[in-house]
Amino acid sequence: MSRFFANGSDSESESSEEEVQAPNFNKASAFQFSDDEEEVKRVVRSTKEKRYENLTSIIKTIRNHKKIKDIPNTLSSFEDLTRAYTKALPVISKEENGITPRFYIRCLAELEDFINEIWEDREGRRNLSKNNTKSLGTLRQKVRKYIKDFEEDLSRFREAPDQESEAEDEEAHVSDAGEAADDSYAGFKKEASVTAPKIAKSAPAKSVPADDEDSDDSIDWDSDSESETESSEDENQYQNMRERFLKRSTEKGEDKGDDDKRKDKRKEQKLKIRKRAEDDEDGEWETVVKGHVVEKPKMFEKDAEIDIPLVLAKLVEIMSARGKKRTDRRLQIDLLFELRDISDQHNLGVPVSVKIHFNIISAIFDYNQKISEPMKMEHWALLLEVMQSMMKLLLANADISISESVAEEHEEYITAPYYIRGCPLAAVERLDDEFTKLLKECDPHSNDYVSRLKDEMNVVKTIELVLQYFEQCGNPNERCRIYLRKIEHLYYKFDPEVLKKKRGELPATTATSVDVMDKLCKFIYAKDDTDRIRTRAILAHIYHHAMHDNWFQARDLVLMSHLQDNIDAADPATRILYNRMMANLGLCAFRQENVKDAHHCLVDLMVTGKPKELLAQGLLPQRQHERSAEQEKIEKQRQMPFHMHINLELLECVYLVSAMLLEIPYIAAHEFDARRRMISKTFYQQLRSSERQSLVGPPESMREHVVAAAKAMRCGNWQACANFIVNKKMNTKVWDLFYESDRVREMLVKFIKEESLRTYLFTYSNVYTSISIPSLAQMYELPVPKVHSIISKMIINEELMASLDDPSETVVMHRSEPSRLQALAMQFVDKVTNLVDVNEKVFDMKQGNFFQRGNMGNRGDRGYNRNQNNQGGNWGGQRRDNRNQRNRNQRGHHKNQQQQQQQQVQTIDEE
């Protein structure tokens, strides 16, 4: 309607006439074929344009999918993109000399960053649906595999992304490739080509200073009016509908010229802005920041006399804002540092400086509002520095006493002895907890974790300073608390000097970590009056002994402390430490050749199937639906840092090997025992599942190696068993993780030989009448005295029915045990007897005594008896007597059946 009223006519009649005259065009002409049709040229696009247009459209689709995090569609679009790029390779090699287009490299880089961002966000990844999670893993693998061919291009792109110029290049590619498609509506082409330069003119004008605002407004108004007139001209131009939608040949030269003009104008505007900024820097001009400027509050007046009461009053004023809603916590820390500098400049004394230090520590702790989240690294470094500085001041001045038992009104800063209210022990405990949170927050496989772990030296140094202070002026309870903090940083660390000292390579006076642990733990045993600190100290002490192969000391501590009786009543952190202690104790027993004890230590952890959770080394994703978000958050806070983890595969391997060395000889000894018990349920299940498989390939995983070794041991083949347990793959995965791994491997081979010998004797004792001891020693590569000792133990324990003939060095087998056929027959008789008994009981329960009466319950007899009883007047008593007689007959019949069955069993045994 705007074009009819554009002239602003004075009378309504004129406007109505214009409205009537406007549609005077012949309607049929809109569908007529133009005589000039031959002059209209169709657009012929090159192969490059088609391929590039296809690539850019797919890239645009991928970006849209990334915005809404639609991972399955992103995956399908990425596959389409790779196929489209493969089709475009001939064009790229011909037109671009084999150089991959920048916009394609940009797309790959953005896609890689997008995947890494989602993958590192563990919280968000857990909340993804099953389809998104599966698609994310597939997309990540495909992208990582695909971009290997573009590593050099990606590295060059990441070094100099050139975002602005790259965007322009991409726009140019898109415009070149899709020029014909965009011009399909020829009526809008002219409008776009006319208005684009005017928008480009008006856009830079916004960056010009305020003096040119009026001119900018006038330019904008002119452009609006011009665009309206152009649109009306375009609508009047295309009188033929077919002509309107015909594709025309594009004037690429003019469009490129317009693009070059736009780029030149943008560069000119940027140069002008840079020159003005340089001119401003030369002068005294300052850039005004939007919003009001908050001035930093003044500490003291100019003429104020700085003394201790004034500084303390200012300190109270600053700390009074602590915990309030609108408090600027960063400004509060800055003010406290400034106050400390003022105190040092005016020599107000060490007590005032210590008090300010302590308040700075409290302010840094308050900076992070969420306790569950770690603090920033800049605050962490500042906290360590201030904490160590305060403790050095306290150690250098013995007349300063800082304690939480000192009331604020009793603080003394002027005359010695000085008394300050505060608790450095609570501060160092909080610092230690913050360090643990920092470690748990970052990726354990990154360099960031290693750099943060280096701060443990500073944390331990700070704990040492606090420990020295409380050894001078602390009570026993405070010393126990700080001793426990030092123990928790020491108990899991291996000290090779302990084993060297055992072997005599170091003098006996050398101080080791075991001596330090003994000193700290014994003080806690004697002085602590809380069960928790003493319990944790005992657990850490046992762990440290077990780590350094002090098996008997660790075992005695466990037995004397009776921890296993009351550990269920302890807090979760203590129970986690108990589980860690039992795991390490089992590894120690295994290294010291106590296979049975190792199995007993590890069975409670491994039989549950979730040692990862019990050791606080991660959460199982299968049980995610069983816990709420709050429970998951609490469990994450209890997790151990990565450098304190125990290798779960090593733990499981030790448990399975120990179970194999115990279970296989036991199975061979009780092969026909129906009441045979399982020593290890987990190992038994692994063995049975392998036996149920119709086709078993060569072992690959650790479990498959142990199961294959167990099958070889059942046949007495110790060499195959040893090869399955000790090989290159198992050494890399498990055995090389042990200290002195060669000694552990030798111990394993020795145990495999001995248990294979026992299994062989159990399995084939019914085949031999006698067997030579030297031949057994040669078969299993064991010394003859060792073989003699093993067989003697088996005979003494009544495991093997045989006798030793020393002159001939043979083992004479006794035929006291039933043969295989006899054992199977006895099992069959037992099962048949049980089946008969069960069937009789079921029959009696269902039918009662009805079918056991005379004549199968004949009604005529019962009527006759009833008439006789009625005549005698004692019908009820006679019925009771008959029932009792029938019951006696049944019991006698059942006894006769049992006697007959026993006789049958005896005859079978005699045969």
Curated annotation (Swiss-Prot):
Residues 885-896 have a biased composition (Basic residues). InterPro entries: EIF3C, EIF3C_N_dom, PCI_dom, WH_DNA-bd_sf. It is found in: Cytoplasm. GO terms for biological process: formation of cytoplasmic translation initiation complex. Residues 23-32 have a biased composition (Polar residues). Pfam families: eIF-3c_N (PF05470), PCI (PF01399). Residues 642-818 form the PCI domain. SUPFAM superfamilies: Winged helix' DNA-binding domain. Residues 196-208, 897-911 have a biased composition (Low complexity). Keywords: Cytoplasm, Initiation factor, Phosphoprotein, Protein biosynthesis. GO terms for molecular function: RNA binding; translation initiation factor activity; translation initiation factor binding. Component of the eukaryotic translation initiation factor 3 (eIF-3) complex, which is involved in protein synthesis of a specialized repertoire of mRNAs and, together with other initiation factors, stimulates binding of mRNA and methionyl-tRNAi to the 40S ribosome. The eIF-3 complex specifically targets and initiates translation of a subset of mRNAs involved in cell proliferation. HAMAP family: eIF3c. This is Eukaryotic translation initiation factor 3 subunit C. It comes from Drosophila pseudoobscura pseudoobscura (Fruit fly). The gene is eIF3c.
